[in-house]
Structures are given as structure tokens and as C-alpha cells.
């Protein structure tokens, strides 16, 4: 079976346009309900969380209707981070978890992703089976077996308490001034409260969601305001989350950014010294910088690369039994603590390193020199396949010859947007620019 509706991170699109319509969400809920509750089975429960997008109300109600129509009992969590849904699915012994979010995308977009009873995102195979059910006639429950829906008030609080248990026992953040940018998203209450309860002086940004300002000039994809706040307040560190708080970017005391590669390098080195890094292996995607690979190799550590997408990082970690992975974009996966990327937990681990070592954020967030990397995105029209054009393939082959032995080239379609991502790494920056610009021009001509 193949997946057409699901991308690399669930179903995603523009709100009120296919597939992010109330009609599709209702049927998707019913299909998921029938997948997790075969005809004649008991009354499983599902938890539903969402971020702060205006369209979340519509999709939450539609999903609830579809799920209850097949006999699923629904527990509504309200706005919570994506990793909270994974945690609460397990903690509340639910059979299914659902998160309504388009992560770092603007408010006009939204998405739906599913978690299994173990708190991990569903496999490609499970999503394909749900699509197959969706394509057919979905049998509803008998009138006496229709599910119920109930709003849960303490879901966020349960997650916050769990977050604090991952912080080293007896350690506090007294004396640390922390800027936290919540992107007007799902962690707008949880993140500042956890930091304050651990003793930090908290300067919160992006904590006034209005349904339309999620990720708007704030958060991990737009950290400029947080960087300015770090400098203006003389803060020790900045933590920037995205709209659903599953990714993080760290800012040092000068407001300079540290991406997921630098964060993973710090954690891998510390965990290896402490004997916590399983099989001396870090899992990251093909997008991670060559400098990270060199840093790990110099310390006798191994980098296992996967396709782009935190779900593929997690799948590789589970297959190999490894416990640390992530993406350059800021998804940091620590399976000792969570089933998916968790920006708040990663931020807490960085703060713990600061508190335990007494070192500045700038000293901890620059583990290696990055190899110059250039990434450009090219938007294309629906139905087009520019990468199959002979002219594009010829330019790519020529670029590979020019980079041979001196760098890396990666060209791929986005799994969540109609974009071609062109990425190259090379010590020779002039060659790097030439190669990327030539490929981008060819893709634009073919798109």
C-alpha cells in the first residue's frame, strides 16, 4: 500500500483547502478510529492536542466527530506541545494520540499527525492502512457504541511535571537569566512555567497567541527578536521553540544562534563522557553538517545518517537501540526521555550543562567549525516534477563532478510543502555558490 495523503510528518496543507478541510478531517478521524477500533472491539480512547492556530478549533471538532462515530472515546487536551501528546498517549494509557499542528509553518497551514499507544508516531505502513480505510466505506459504530468526548484540564500540567523529572535531581537554575521564545505556539504557558519553577529568571516572548500570530516573526525559525532580547536584558542564554515546540534553537549570551547540529554535538560529547551514549552513536539526517561528522569521528563516535524527517531519525534510533538523534533544524530526540523531538526537554538539557559546568552558552554551543553550507528552496506548481527534467538532471550530474571529493550535494523534495530543497557543502565557498545557483536556476526553469 502507498501513502498519498500522508507526508513525512502526517497530513498537512492550507487550512480549509484540501486536505485540511473539516470534511477530510472528519473522515480521517473515522478511518483512524476504525483502524484502532476494529468492528466489535471495546471502547478505546484517544487523546487530541493542538497548537494555537485558529483552524485548530475546526479540525479538532471534525476529528472528534469522526473518531467518536466509530466508538472511540476522545480526551481533548487543548493547546499542548507535540511531544506532550506522545507522552500523554502513553501516560493516560490511550490507544491513539493525535496532534493538530503544522509545526513551524505559518498560521494559514495546519496538519494532523498520529501517535500509536507507545507514544511514537505511526509508521508509514500504518498510515497507508488508514488511507486504505479512508478510500472505502467506513463502517460507523452502532448507536449505543458511539464514543464520548471529554476535555482534560490537567494534561499540560502533567507534561510540565514530567519535564522537570528529566532535569538532574537537586540542580536548580538560580542565577540564570533565560529568554524563552514560544513562537506564540503550543508551549506558550508550559515552557516559561517549567523554567520559572526550576529557578530561572525568565524573560518570555511569543506568549500571546491570537490564532494568527504563531511563528510570525518569532520562534526557532525567526529568532531575531529573541536575540535582541538576550542582548537588551543581558541574558545568559536564549531558547527558541517552534509552533508545536518539537524543535529548538539556542542563542548564546551575545544572541548568536546554535542549531541542532551544535546542540547534538554538545549532548553527544557529554553523554559519551558519562557513559550514556549508546553504542557511541548519534543519529542525524543527511542535512547535518559535515563538520558534525568530523567532530564525532575525532572522538571515536559514529554518525548514522537517515532521510530528512524526525520520524526517520526516531525509526533508526529504535532499530539500532540508540538514544540520541535529531536534525539540524532543531529536532532533538532523546529516547531516554521522549518519543519524539522535544524542544523544551532539549533546552533543559542545555541549561543543565550550563549549570553543571559553570560555562557560558557561547562556550557550550560552538563545539565544531561548520563546513560552509548553502541551502535554497525552490517552489514549484502542484503536479510538476522538476527533478525529472533532463536539463535539471544534467546540471546535477555536472555539479556532482565539480564537488567530487571536496563537498556534498543533496537535492530533495520537501515532504510537507511544494518545495525543492537544494543543499550543498564545500570548503570552497565560491564553488559552493556556483553549484547551488546553477541547480536552482535549472529547477526554476523546469518548474
UniProtKB/Swiss-Prot annotation:
Entry keyword annotation includes Phosphoprotein: yes
Database matches in InterPro entries: A-D-PHexomutase_a/b/a-I, A-D-PHexomutase_a/b/a-I/II/III, A-D-PHexomutase_a/b/a-II, A-D-PHexomutase_a/b/a-III, A-D-PHexomutase_C, A-D-PHexomutase_C_sf, A-D-PHexomutase_CS, Alpha-D-phosphohexomutase_SF
GO CC entries: cytosol
Positions of disulphide bridges: none
Cofactor: Mg(2+)
One GO-annotated biological process of the protein: peptidoglycan biosynthetic process
Sites bearing Phosphoserine, chain numbering: 103
Catalytic activity from the UniProt record: alpha-D-glucosamine 1-phosphate = D-glucosamine 6-phosphate
Residues bound to Mg(2+): 103, 242, 244, 246
Record's comment on post-translational modification: Activated by phosphorylation.
Active-site residues per Swiss-Prot or TrEMBL entry: 103
Function comment: Catalyzes the conversion of glucosamine-6-phosphate to glucosamine-1-phosphate.
Protein name: Phosphoglucosamine mutase
Amino acid at each position: 500500500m502507498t501513502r498519498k495523503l500522508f507526508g513525512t510528518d502526517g497530513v498537512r496543507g492550507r487550512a480549509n483547502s484540501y486536505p485540511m478541510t473539516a470534511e477530510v478531517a472528519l473522515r480521517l478521524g473515522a478511518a483512524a478510529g476504525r483502524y484502532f477500533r476494529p468492528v466489535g472491539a471495546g471502547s478505546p480512547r484517544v487523546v487530541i492536542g493542538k497548537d494555537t492556530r485558529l483552524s485548530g478549533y475546526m479540525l479538532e471538532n471534525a476529528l472528534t466527530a469522526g473518531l467518536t462515530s466509530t466508538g472511540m472515546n476522545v480526551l481533548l487536551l487543548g493547546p499542548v506541545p507535540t511531544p506532550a501528546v506522545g507522552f500523554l498517549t502513553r501516560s493516560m494509557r490511550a490507544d491513539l494520540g493525535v496532534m493538530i499542528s503544522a509545526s513551524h509553518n505559518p498560521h494559514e497551514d495546519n496538519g494532523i499527525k498520529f501517535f500509536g499507544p507507545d507514544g511514537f508516531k505511526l509508521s508509514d505502513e500504518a498510515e497507508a492502512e488508514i488511507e486504505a480505510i479512508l478510500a472505502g466505506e467506513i463502517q460507523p459504530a452502532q448507536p449505543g457504541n458511539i464514543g464520548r468526548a471529554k476535555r482534560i484540564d490537567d494534561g499540560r500540567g502533567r507534561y510540565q511535571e514530567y519535564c522537570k523529572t528529566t532535569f538532574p535531581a537537586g540542580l536548580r537554575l538560580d542565577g540564570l537569566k533565560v529568554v524563552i521564545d514560544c513562537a506564540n505556539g503550543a508551549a506558550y504557558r508550559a515552557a516559561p512555567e517549567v523554567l520559572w519553577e526550576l529557578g530561572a529568571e525568565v524573560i518570555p516572548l511569543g506568549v500571546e497567541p491570537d490564532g494568527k500570530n504563531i511563528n510570525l516573526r518569532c520562534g526557532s525559525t525567526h529568532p531575531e527578536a529573541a536575540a535582541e532580547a538576550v542582548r537588551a536584558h543581558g541574558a545568559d542564554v536564549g531558547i527558541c521553540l517552534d509552533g508545536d515546540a518539537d524543535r529548538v534553537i539556542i542563542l548564546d549570551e551575545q544572541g548568536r544562534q546554535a542549531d541542532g547540529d551544535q546542540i547534538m554535538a554538545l549532548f553527544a560529547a557529554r553523554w559519551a563522557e558519562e557513559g550514556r551514549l549508546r553504542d557511541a552513536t548519534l543519529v542525524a539526517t543527511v542535512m547535518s553538517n559535515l563538520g558534525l561528522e568530523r567532530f564525532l569521528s575525532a572522538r571515536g563516535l559514529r554518525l548514522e545518517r537517515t532521510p530528512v524527517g524526525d520520524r526517520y531519525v526516531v525509526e533508526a534510533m529504535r532499530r539500532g537501540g540508540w538514544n540520541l538523534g535529531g536534525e539540524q533544524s532543531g529536532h532533538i530526540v532523546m529516547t531516554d526521555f521522549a518519543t519524539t523531538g522535544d524542544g523544551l526537554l532539549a533546552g533543559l538539557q542545555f541549561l543543565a550543562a550550563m549549570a553543571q559546568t559553570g560555562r557560558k552558552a557561547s562556550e557550550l554551543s560552538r563545539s565544531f567549525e561548520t563546513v560552509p553550507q548553502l541551502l535554497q528552496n525552490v517552489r514549484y506548481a502542484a503536479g510538476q516534477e522538476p527533478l525529472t527534467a533532463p536539463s535539471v538532471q544534467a546540471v546535477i550530474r555536472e555539479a556532482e563532478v565539480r564537488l567530487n571529493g571536496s563537498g556534498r550535494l543533496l537535492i530533495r523534495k520537501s515532504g510537507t510543502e511544494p518545495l525543492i530543497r537544494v543543499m550543498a557543502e564545500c570548503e570552497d565557498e565560491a564553488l559552493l555558490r556556483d553549484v547551488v545557483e546553477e541547480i536552482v536556476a535549472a529547477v526554476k526553469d523546469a518548474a
